[in-house]
Amino acid sequence: DPAGITTYSVLGADYGYQLLWVLVASMLALIVLHDLAARIGVVTRQGMIGLIRQKYGARSGTLSAGALVLANVGTMTAEFAGIAAAGQLFGLSKYVSVPVAAIAVSFLVLRNSFSTVEKVFFVISAGFIAYIIAGFMAGPDWGAAAKGVLIPTIPFTQEAIFIATATIGTTLAPWGLAFIQSYAVDKRLTKDDLLF
């Protein structure tokens, strides 16, 4: 998630621990909203766009679907920009890394079952453990971090408000809610699958 990594990095680089509470609040909201979206999918057996169409009509459903497509295009653009940047760190041209990645992802998604794709991305996501390890290796000031999490403060500057808003926006992406709700439907989850 290059957009998220960039946003979180700017948040930390520019404000240290001061706005850490924004990240924690965003993650808590992410957990609650994704849980809610999954529950809506379980109970209604419909994805988000289908429910919008049913409740508000075809025009609203079409507009919502269009907005999600635009959001997905933006997200994919950011992902491939991240692939290009990562490739350049290793001396690989973006004109090589991006097409190779696009072909590999397209092949994976279009030529394999959903279950296989899910397993591959689950294994790849294990790489995120490196962020946790790097965080501990950086030797943070745990007292300042706790203060940044527990005592919300924000400098009332345009830059601080912008990065706080960007953090919330990159964490709570609407396409993620639509995906989770549809995922619950596609996996045929039932009320018995819910923990509470």
Question: Could you describe each region identified by the protein language model?
Answer:
Residues 63-66, 89-110, 127, 131:
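Transmembrane alpha-helical segments of multi-pass small-molecule transport proteins
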